[in-house]
Amino acid sequence: MCTAVRLTDKNNNLYVGRNLDWGVPFGEKPLLVPADWTWQSRHIGAIATQSPIIGMGLLMKDMPLYFDAVNEAGLYCAGLSFAAGFAHYNDADPSKINVTSFEMPLWVCSEFTTVAQVKEAAQNLNITNDAFDPSLPTSDLHWFVADKDQSIVIEQTAEGLKIYDDGFDVLTNQPDFQFHCNNMRNYIHLDGDWTPERTMRNAHLTALGVGPSVMGLPGDPSAISRFVRVALLNA
């Protein structure tokens, strides 16, 4: 179960992160790489980081495999589970920018400083089906990319690469992001404001307490319900 969220305060300071709920530990730990550190992308070749990057992930063969990461410019990228047949990676395409799924957070944070830059580059992006090695198969993921101004979602599907502006500043897991957006229309009546009293014809009512304005908010841990819950709390 993974949920990512972006928010800013009144001074436009960025707060962004995700939870990472595994049934068993994988040896994940904080990983820091410095500026001007060069790594070898599977298809692009040598890439030098523009600024320091910190995040959570695995260190395999001296390669940081980030679950999520942020660079010094405040650009953040997280890979969240997108399983059950929703993710669809491709063979490398010589006409595209080919990035493996395990490289995505590192690639984003190495090459760019804003979401707008990522969005422009992703128009020609192809996420490939390469595994890191035989002992570490490909993970089915979609990606939440955020900075102080906005967030986007990137999904590689059977229909092609999808890039969505994320007005909710939230991402969970499958189904696809468009499903979550449409599903939010079922909860348009929910409101975080408290209505202490109301008159209905000749009857005057006072609230029994705080909370009735969000009656019907789903409380289960499914990805669909988590998206609704965090989107409302982040509204």
Where are each of the predicted segments found?
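A short, surface-exposed interaction/processing loop segment used at functional sites
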Residues: 23-43, 162-190
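C-terminus-biased signal that marks the final domain/tail of proteins
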Residues: 1-15, 51, 130-131, 138-139, ...
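Short helix/loop capping segments that flank catalytic or ligand/cofactor-binding pockets
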Residues: 25-26, 80, 86-88, 153-156, ...
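Short acidic-glycine loop/turn motifs at beta-strand connectors
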Residues: 8-11, 71-73, 146-150, 155-160, ...
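Structured loops at beta-to-helix junctions and adjacent beta-edge loops in soluble globular domains
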Residues: 19, 73, 80, 146-148, ...
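Alpha/propeptide regions of enzymes that mature by internal proteolysis
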Residues: 8, 94-128, 221-235
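Aromatic- and glycine-enriched pocket-lining scaffold segments that form the walls
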Residues: 115, 119-155
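A contiguous strand-loop segment
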Residues: 1-96, 129
